[in-house]
């Protein structure tokens, strides 16, 4: 043996007990005899042999030649007969063989004999390969580790020897020499120089020796590893020919892959230049090729010992240093080819265009996390994901940071952020996606953020893009998008053409982003300077950037950068460089004044920050600050009348807000209290309360220009006056405070309950503070909280108040206001929510709130679906929590419209109404006796206390019912004073119980009276008189709760009649009229008059105002009905009372204008009852909206006209609707502004040809000023739905839902546009001729040779244009090229369809199947399989890429539409997607099969978190596979199974993805039930296809995955 073998110790046996077994010595002797080794030679004996070959020849002992190999079997059988335990002998033999393989691998003759011996023993079935091969590979790994340690030791020895030789270099200084030195003082002698040179030479020699030793060690190890691995591979090739278990195959595969992936790993710690020397040697190729032979044998399709998919997920293709080996390169290329083919099925068409549109307020994350709903508000949100090479959606900050700038993924991420900055989605969205810039993170948070998908660099780039975009708009010389934005917000006198509103909206979010620390401020300034001095050096002409930076100059991070950062001087100089002299034609315009002085404000602030930067300030601007002081002394210090300020004064006051925020704040507060104070009237002297007199609140036009610093100071001081001061604030103060919060929703928002609790925990214990907070929230800030995503949190806070008060006697006002607010909050939620913050136990809601929660769930599920799979799991628990404290049963008419998820749960509940009446009848006698004593006209007032202290609660709940019976329509029959006192002094919970029992008893006695022969009119008149006593005469009960209780008994034929009569009562109508007059405009933020405070008793009635003296601000009995009327409308429609519903809307349409969320309310009713509403009622509902402010299509009214027969609008109408979404909802393709040409990487990819110079102007459904886009509106202008993007999308939804034609007609029109849009747009220059002869015929196959299409195929193709579309204006109104526009219209259509109810989805699936089936080349039986495969490959190309060559196809467009649709669907609605496969079956060709997989494949990763739906979809895909490759399949031409290898790989991959619940890892395994499902389906497949799925079964004897499950189960049981 050579040196390498002598360094290897003998491998220990698998069991130490066999080491001393007598058979072991005999077996070793036998093998040593045939190996030509000395008898019983110890494994390490060879270490003493000298390495010199000549010495070995001289000293070699005389040995006999070994016996012939043919004799071995006889000798072995003879030895075998000497021992009784054959199994033990086999184990020992295997152990010895493994040891000999390790020792003799570098000795070719001995290695050959070992191979011979193994073959011989294999022929007699003596080797158990399933134990032998894993043990062999384990021993090889141990031997390689030992080799590495030995080589490291040798290298260390060589290094130490070289060091020692260097340390003993002699230096001859010869101190005893008598000869004088020949050199001057300090000069070395010749001998010294020579000795130093000798020392350096010796050191270099030592280094060379060390390097040579290292190289020799490397070569020795390489040779040893090569021989050992090569011999092992040869043995494995022998073993694999036997029938091995799947576990053995898997283990062999893992070892082989580990060897290949780590082929160049160096364990010696040497430098790379030293370690490379052995890689290119012949030894590498030998073992590597043997290893490849094993792998090819394992993945051989004929045997399929290991599925080829294991190679795809092995990571072999990612090795950094691919050796120069053709065989390995061939394998890697094959892996890449099959991986790409498989990954395609994971990716949606045009996936790089899929990006959140923010068209809904729902946050839909692209990742799923198994968390309870109560934890959702704290989750990180991943709005996009990055596809891996295997097509899996990935996320994480470490991944995002690896995205190269300028790549498609980078552009997609920045596109998303740009669109968010433009459309200002919920701050809650921003908080969940932002990452703190690394420079601002504490050391404890140094690691990457797992759920993040954006980096600070991406956010910085998007911010700068938006600044550049706004600068270009400002410089355009015309107002934004062709209309005057400012006039929308301000009076005409403040209008300018510089897109001031756009800047205001952006400054709010800019402040929010900078304060969040999501981008490095110093780096941001550097990049902004480079951008404005580089490509865009001509656009900075105004002081808008200086103004923008002045807004944030007091942010802590900014002050740190300007005061203590190392680059503070440079940063300051760059900030000052943005100053430009103002050249506005109107110097008195408020914005012009501000921009003219803002540089001075900035210089003054920087001067006060740091002395080191003062030298760089502009003295002229500093001196200009004196003008500000002079103006302030002359005008500002005295009381200012903010309602009569001229333009210049407004501008100067804005300037003052930047330089003297505190004085400016004080003047505003002084103005709001300038009318003085007065005593609250009607109080006793000892109850004296002071109240601030009313003035006009500050107008929005003035507030909008305040600096953010002043706004924050004002908010704090106002909160002090509102919630801490003992003086009752004025309505003007409250209104101004809410306007501050509405004008800057990102920067100014605060959660009121949390903030007040932090400021002073005792504040909320004061009734006045609690009432004021509840009123502000209920009547002013409800939409703001929804926009912020804080409605659920607020609901939990309010629920705490309700829970604490519902059993407390007397606190009715706070309780009913809190209940009404909670009612509004629940009805405003359009996403799933947990009914308890903790998530466990029954709800703390009242019975009323429980019922409203069920209704809200029904509306949400039916109109928007459940977005998250975890919410679907939690739904049942939530229902149990609600129903645990609610006894209500919903009528059949109501549940008929409920979604099936709710209906199945609720339909089994027992109706306890009969039991309720029985309980009343049992208690009736006692109740009437008590009521007679309490309520007789002559009853003593003192009896009230006796009644309250001695009556039982089960009897008190019938008090109002008993009073009603005693009254008999005559109010004088009862003592109203005593009744009112009892109802005030019992708890709110008991009043609610009285209301519900009153409804039941009232309806019961209506039936009794009718049975006794009384007329219906007389009975209802009596009931009306009784109710008038409670609600109008004495105001004893809350009307809103009674109405809700009444309509919930809608299965009683008289309940809705009584409810409608109450809503039409003159008393109520008068109250509503007075409320509207006192309230003024529904847009309260525009009111510039002095608010009039309503008297407490007039506003709330006797019951709620009782002993309370704290005045109201906005609260009113009429306002409490706003959430109730829509629910009454629901009940009327459910009961088919359409005429009454129309009358209700007619009577209260003006009042409903005050509904805080009326746009959402109209949209949801149209969606909830789609298909059941008559056209007249639809029109009435639309009139509830402020039509002048809704961007409806100009032609929309003519298609919903009640006159004439319903007509489906032309295609031009639908195309324009989609164009409007492209222009206002779909994220733009580049960072360039709406007024400039499109550019950027993604846009370039969409179209490489030259684009026209015209810019993207906001599309309108029809030309005309009435529909012109109004640009970016402030939040307060569109509080419902919240953003302009949402408004445009939801308006399109309302239009579609209002059309008087079927869903099938609408979907057919949309699909017809989409499948032919590209050919229509491109060929529009040639005119339009003819009509569409079927949607599927309009596609064109590519004619390129690589497309595989032939002349005969192209000869019969036809193009189909869409008739009726004015494409000339269509394209010009978009600002995109034809190719770009066609792709974006597909995205817009998918988004729109995903917002519509499931009725439309069913039609879409039918249309998609029809288009696919009608494709002529899929039906052409004359085409070869190769032609069809090529055709389907090109047909399923991304429309983005197909658009470049004008090769868009019907199938490609329809699949892209489905994928855009899928990406916007909530999780629950994905359940219906399986209808596509059902509609396409039976699948009759491989081409059609590929279409099916291409449609549904990308959906499966989203379904991985919904196991049941995943199984269902997978089963249908397998059924389609059986259609083509089943044993009884009737296909036109036989197809080999190898042609669907990519589909087989995809099936392997997706079940691993589902088993892992995410990206596939090395430990990922499929679920056993999935294996069982595929196994059952495989039984019906052809044998050759079955063979490809052999491992996707539950049989551990044939499946490596089933065997792995069995192993894990065994380990678990053992442990």
Curated annotation (Swiss-Prot):
One of its GO terms (cellular component) is mediator complex. InterPro entries: Mediator_Med23. Residues 1230-1241 have a biased composition (Low complexity). Residues 40-67, 1230-1270 are annotated as: Disordered. Keywords: Nucleus, Transcription, Transcription regulation. Pfam families: Med23. It is found in: Nucleus. Component of the Mediator complex. PANTHER family: MEDIATOR OF RNA POLYMERASE II TRANSCRIPTION SUBUNIT 23 (PTHR12691:SF10). Belongs to the Mediator complex subunit 23 family. Component of the Mediator complex, a coactivator involved in the regulated transcription of nearly all RNA polymerase II-dependent genes. Mediator functions as a bridge to convey information from gene-specific regulatory proteins to the basal RNA polymerase II transcription machinery. The Mediator complex, having a compact conformation in its free form, is recruited to promoters by direct interactions with regulatory proteins and serves for the assembly of a functional preinitiation complex with RNA polymerase II and the general transcription factors. This is Mediator of RNA polymerase II transcription subunit 23. It comes from Arabidopsis thaliana (Mouse-ear cress). The lineage of its organism: Eukaryota, Viridiplantae, Streptophyta, Embryophyta, Tracheophyta.
């Amino acid at each position: 043996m050579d040196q390498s073998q002598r360094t290897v110790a003998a491998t220990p046996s698998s069991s130490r007990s066999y080491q001393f077994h007598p058979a072991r010595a005999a077996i070793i002797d036998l093998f040593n005899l045939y190996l030509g080794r000395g008898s019983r030679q110890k494994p390490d004996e060879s270490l003493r042999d000298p390495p010199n070959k000549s010495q070995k020849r001289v000293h070699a002992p005389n040995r006999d030649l070994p016996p012939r190999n043919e004799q071995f079997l006889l000798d072995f059988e003879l030895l075998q007969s000497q021992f009784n335990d054959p199994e033990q002998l086999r184990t020992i033999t295997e152990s010895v063989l493994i040891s000999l393989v390790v020792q003799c691998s570098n000795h070719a003759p001995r290695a050959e004999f070992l191979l011979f011996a193994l073959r011989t023993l294999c022929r007699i079935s003596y080797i158990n390969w399933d134990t032998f091969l894993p043990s062999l590979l384990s021993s090889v790994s141990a031997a390689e580790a030992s080799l590495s340690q030995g080589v490291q030791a040798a290298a260390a020895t060589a290094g130490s020897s070289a060091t020692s030789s260097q340390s003993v270099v002699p230096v001859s200084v010869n101190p005893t020499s008598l000869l004088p030195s020949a050199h001057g003082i300090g000069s070395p002698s010749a001998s010294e120089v020579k000795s130093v040179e000798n020392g350096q030479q010796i050191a270099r020699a030592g280094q060379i020796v060390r390097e040579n030793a290292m190289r020799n060690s490397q070569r020795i190890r390489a040779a040893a590893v090569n021989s050992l691995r090569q011999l092992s591979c040869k043995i494995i090739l022998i073993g694999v020919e036997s029938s091995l278990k799947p576990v053995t195959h898997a283990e062999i595969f893992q070892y082989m892959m580990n060897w290949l992936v780590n082929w160049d790993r160096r364990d010696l710690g040497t430098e790379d230049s030293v370690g490379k020397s052995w890689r290119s040697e012949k030894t590498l190729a030998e073992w590597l090729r043997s290893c490849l032979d094993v792998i090819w044998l394992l993945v051989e399709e004929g045997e399929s010992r290991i599925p080829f998919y294991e190679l795809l997920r092995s990571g072999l293709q990612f090795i950094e240093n691919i050796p120069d080996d053709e065989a390995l390169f061939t394998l890697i290329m094959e892996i890449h080819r099959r991986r790409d083919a498989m990954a395609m099925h994971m990716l949606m068409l045009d996936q790089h265009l899929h990006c959140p549109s923010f068209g809904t307020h729902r946050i839909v994350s692209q990742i799923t996390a198994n968390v309870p709903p109560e934890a959702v508000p704290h989750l990180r949100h991943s709005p996009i994901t990055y596809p891996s090479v295997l097509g899996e959606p990935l996320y994480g900050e470490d991944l995002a940071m690896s995205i190269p700038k300028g790549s498609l993924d980078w552009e997609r991420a920045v596109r998303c952020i740009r669109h968010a900055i433009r459309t200002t989605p919920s701050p809650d969205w921003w908080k969940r996606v932002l990452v703190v810039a690394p420079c601002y993170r504490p050391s404890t948070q140094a690691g990457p953020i797992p759920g993040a998908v954006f980096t600070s660099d991406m956010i910085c780039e998007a911010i700068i893009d938006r600044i550049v975009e706004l600068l270009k708009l400002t410089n355009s010389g015309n107002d934004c998008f062709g209309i005057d934005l400012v006039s929308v917000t301000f009076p005409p006198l403040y209008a300018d053409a510089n897109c001031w509103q756009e800047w205001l909206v952006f400054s709010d979010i800019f402040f929010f982003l900078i304060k969040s620390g999501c981008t490095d401020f110093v780096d941001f300034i550097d990049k902004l300077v480079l951008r404005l001095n580089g490509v865009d050096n001509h656009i900075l002409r105004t002081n808008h950037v200086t103004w923008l930076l002045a807004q944030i100059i007091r942010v802590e991070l900014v002050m740190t950068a300007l005061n203590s950062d190392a680059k503070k001087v440079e940063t300051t100089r760059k900030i000052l460089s943005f100053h430009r002299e103002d050249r506005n034609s109107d110097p008195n315009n408020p914005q012009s004044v501000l921009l003219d002085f803002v540089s001075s404000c900035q210089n003054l602030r920087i001067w006060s920050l740091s002395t080191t930067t003062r030298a760089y300030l502009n003295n002229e601007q500093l001196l200009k600050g004196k003008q500000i002081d002079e103006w302030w002394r002359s005008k500002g210090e005295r009381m200012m009348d903010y309602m009569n300020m001229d333009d210049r004064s407004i501008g100067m006051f804005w300037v003052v807000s930047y330089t003297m925020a505190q004085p400016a704040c004080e003047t505003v507060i002084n103005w709001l209290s300038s009318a003085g104070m007065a005593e609250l009237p009607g109080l006793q002297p000892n109850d004296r309360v002071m109240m601030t007199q009313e003035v006009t609140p500050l107008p929005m036009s003035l507030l909008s220009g305040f600096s953010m610093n002043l706004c924050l100071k004002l908010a704090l001081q106002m909160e002090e006056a509102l919630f801490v001061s003992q003086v009752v604030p004025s309505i003007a103060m409250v209104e101004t405070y809410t306007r501050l919060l509405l004008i800057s929703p990102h920067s100014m928002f605060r959660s009121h309950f949390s903030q007040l609790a932090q400021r002073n925990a005792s504040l909320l214990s004061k009734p006045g503070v609690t009432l004021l907070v509840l009123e502000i929230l209920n009547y002013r800030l409800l939409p703001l909280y929804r926009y912020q995503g804080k409605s659920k949190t607020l609901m939990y806070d309010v629920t705490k108040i309700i829970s604490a008060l519902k059993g407390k006697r007397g606190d009715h006002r706070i309780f009913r206001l809190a209940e009404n607010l909670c009612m509004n909050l629940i009805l405003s939620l359009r996403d799933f929510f947990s009914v308890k913050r903790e998530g466990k136990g029954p709800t703390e809601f009242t019975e009323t709130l429980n019922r409203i929660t069920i209704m809200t769930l029904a509306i949400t599920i039916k109109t928007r679906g459940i977005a998250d799979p975890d919410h679907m799991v939690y739904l049942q628990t939530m229902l149990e929590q609600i129903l645990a404290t609610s006894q209500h049963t919903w009528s059949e008419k109501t549940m008929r419209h409920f979604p099936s998820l709710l209906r199945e749960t609720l339909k089994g509940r027992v109706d306890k109404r009969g039991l309720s009446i029985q309980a009343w009848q049992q208690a009736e006698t006692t109740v009437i006796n008590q009521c007679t004593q309490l309520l007789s006209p002559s009853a003593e007032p003192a009896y009230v206390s006796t009644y309250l202290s001695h009556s039982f609660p089960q009897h008190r709940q019938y008090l109002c019912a008993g009073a009603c019976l005693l009254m008999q329509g005559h109010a004088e029959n009862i003592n109203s004073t005593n009744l009112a006192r009892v109802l005030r002094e019992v708890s709110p919970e008991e009043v609610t119980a009285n209301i519900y029992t009153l409804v039941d008893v009232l309806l019961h006695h209506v039936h009794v009276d009718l049975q006794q022969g009384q007329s219906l009119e007389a009975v209802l008149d009596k009931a009306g008189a009784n109710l008038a006593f409670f609600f109008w005469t004495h105001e004893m009960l809350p009307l809103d709760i009674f109405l809700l209780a009444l309509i919930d008994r809608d299965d009683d034929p008289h309940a809705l009649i009584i409810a409608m009569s109450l809503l039409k009562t003159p008393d109520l109508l008068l109250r509503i009229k007075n409320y509207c007059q006192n309230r003024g405009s529904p847009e309260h933020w525009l009111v510039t008059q002095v608010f009039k405070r309503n008297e407490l008793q007039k506003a709330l009635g006797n019951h709620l105002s009782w002993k309370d003296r704290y005045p109201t601000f906005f609260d009113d009995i009429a306002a409490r009905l706003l959430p109730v009327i829509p629910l009454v409308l629901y009940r009327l429609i459910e009961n088919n009372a359409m005429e009454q519903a129309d009358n209700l809307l007619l009577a209260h349409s003006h009042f409903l204008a005050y509904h805080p969320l009326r746009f959402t309310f109209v949209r949801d009713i149209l969606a909830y009852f789609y298909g059941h509403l008559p056209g007249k009622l639809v029109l009435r509902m639309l009139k509830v909206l402020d039509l002048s402010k809704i961007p409806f299509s100009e032609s929309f009214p003519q298609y919903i006209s009640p006159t004439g027969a319903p007509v489906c609008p032309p295609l031009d109408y639908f195309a324009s609707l989609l164009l409007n979404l492209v222009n206002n909802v779909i994220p733009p393709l580049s960072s360039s502004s709406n007024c400039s040409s499109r550019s950027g990487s993604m846009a370039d990819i969409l179209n490489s040809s030259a684009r026209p110079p015209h810019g993207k102007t906001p599309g309108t459904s029809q030309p005309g000023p009435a529909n012109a886009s109004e640009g970016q509106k402030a939040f307060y202008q569109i509080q419902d739905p919240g953003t302009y993007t949402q408004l445009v999308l939801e308006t399109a939804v309302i239009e579609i839902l209002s059309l008087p034609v079927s869903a099938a007609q609408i979907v057919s029109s949309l699909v017809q546009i989409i499948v032919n849009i590209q050919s229509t747009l491109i060929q529009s220059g040639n005119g339009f001729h003819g009509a569409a002869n079927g949607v599927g015929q309009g596609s064109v196959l590519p004619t390129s040779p690589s497309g595989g299409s032939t002349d005969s195929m192209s000869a019969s193709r036809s193009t189909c244009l869409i008739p009726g579309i004015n494409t000339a204006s269509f394209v010009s109104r978009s600002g995109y090229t034809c190719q770009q526009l066609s792709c974006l219209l597909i995205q817009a259509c998918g988004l729109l369809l995903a917002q519509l109810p499931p009725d439309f989805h069913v039609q879409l699936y039918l249309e998609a199947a029809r288009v696919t089936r009608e494709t002529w080349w899929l039906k052409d039986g004359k085409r070869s399989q190769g032609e069809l495969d090529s055709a389907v490959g090109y047909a399923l190309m991304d429309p983005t890429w197909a658009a470049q060559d004008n090769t868009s196809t019907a199938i490609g467009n329809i699949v892209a539409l489905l994928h855009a649709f899928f990406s916007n669907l909530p999780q629950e609605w994905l359940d219906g997607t399986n209808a596509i496969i059902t509609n396409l079956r039976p699948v009759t060709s491989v081409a059609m099969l590929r279409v099916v997989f291409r449609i549904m494949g990308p959906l499966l990763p989203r379904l991985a978190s919904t196991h049941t739906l995943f199984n269902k979809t997978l089963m249908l895909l397998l059924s389609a596979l059986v259609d083509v490759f089943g044993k009884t399949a009737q296909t036109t031409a036989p197809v080999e199974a190898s042609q669907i290898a990519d589909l087989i790989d995809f099936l392997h991959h997706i079940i691993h993805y589902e088993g892992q619940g995410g990206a596939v890892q090395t430990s990922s395994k499929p679920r056993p039930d999935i294996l069982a499902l595929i196994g059952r389906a495989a039984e019906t497949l052809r044998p050759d296809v079955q063979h490809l799925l052999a491992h996707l079964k539950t049989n551990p004897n044939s499946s490596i995955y089933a065997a792995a499950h069995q192993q894990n189960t065994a380990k678990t049981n053992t442990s």
